[in-house]
Amino acid sequence: MNRMFDLVLGTGNAKKLVELRMMLPEETIALTALSEIENAIDVVEDGETFSANAAKKATEQAKHLERWVLAEDSGLSVDALKGAPGVYSARYAGTHGDDEANNEKLLRELTDVPMDRRGAQFNCHLCLSDPDGNVRLAESGICRGRIATERSGGAGFGYDPLFVIPEYHKTFGELNLTVKRALSHRSRALRLFIPQLLRLVQSNSTSA
């Protein structure tokens, strides 16, 4: 592969961007953050599923920019809350991206719910669109755990301080980055996604 594959990472979330960049092969792919593109558009995330939101963000941004775009949608689904907060994870308490308020609301919603009924999972859906707005690749990853009764740890973001990994008896907020990267929903989705992406890059390079 002589030419770098130009790929826009279609997320405005700086912390998600860091995770994506850490796992994507930058020796093969020229990564550009959405924040680095002046004419990027804001895509309304009004889908009822993570996959619908990821596809919409990827295809609409790709058509607008006429570039390859990788978009991601992720969130937390709690068993006792019938899957909530789900696609509303980032704005569960009303304001988009207010992690503290979202965590506080989740704890209130689970008041008096025993630990054996506090099962939950993080979900991640990745979608790659070509410059014409066609979905070329899509992959998902999940990570099962439980919701703690109080926040622990200052690492990570979002609901990480509440999400307990049973095997480690620690929250994502307490685990070191290496362990979290091995276990997280985003990492699991990327491990499935990257080999497919590299095959597509190879094919694109060969046919160019």
UniProtKB/Swiss-Prot annotation:
Q: Which residues bind substrate?
A: 11-16, 74, 157-160, 180, 185-186
UniProt xrefs under SUPFAM superfamilies: ITPase-like (SSF52972)
What is an example of a Pfam family matching this protein? Answer: Ham1p_like
The record's keywords, sorted A to Z, are: Hydrolase, Magnesium, Metal-binding, Nucleotide metabolism, Nucleotide-binding
Q: Which GO terms describe its cellular component?
A: cytoplasm; cytosol
GO BP field: nucleoside triphosphate catabolic process; nucleotide metabolic process; purine nucleoside triphosphate catabolic process
Under the heading Gene3D superfamilies, the entry gives: 3.90.950.10
Q: Where is the active site?
A: 73 (proton acceptor)
Q: Which InterPro entries match?
A: dITP/XTP_pyrophosphatase, ITPase-like_fam, RdgB/HAM1
Record-listed E.C. numbers? 3.6.1.66
Names of the cofactor(s): Mg(2+)
Q: How does the record describe its quaternary structure?
A: Homodimer.
* UniProt similarity note: Belongs to the HAM1 NTPase family.
NCBIfam families, from UniProt?
A: RdgB/HAM1 family non-canonical purine NTP pyrophosphatase
| Name of the protein in question | dITP/XTP pyrophosphatase
Origin organism is: Rhodopirellula baltica (strain DSM 10527 / NCIMB 13988 / SH1)
